[in-house]
Amino acid sequence: DQIGKAEALWRSADMYLNTQVAEVWERTCCSGICSMDNRIMLRLAGTHTIHQAKAVTDIVYDLCSTDSIFQHNDIQRRFQDIHVIAQHMQGIPEIYSIVGRHFLGLPVNSHLV
């Protein structure tokens, strides 16, 4: 059941990200500008996808048990990489706060958008 859960998490995040990128691309090509709404939607989709990828990697890492800790195991490198990416500015929890402020009509003064 964990592999099925991981697959569902990944596929839904991947579809969400690709849908948002396509929609923003189309709107930007039509208008010639990437609006704040578009930038917010891209940030949200990107951050969400990072955290879902981290959750998927954690599931697989746990399933591999102690084999996961060895450098010759590919999952170890992927585990390390996704945890680093989640700490990058694109993956930080503050993104959700910024998006929430935007959706509530509150000012967003951030270089992260």
What is the meaning of each model-derived region?
Residues 4-11, 43, 47-54, 80-83, ...:
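Generic structural signal for well-ordered, non-transmembrane alpha-helical segments
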Residues 26-43, 68-84:
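Charge-rich, acidic-biased intrinsically disordered regions
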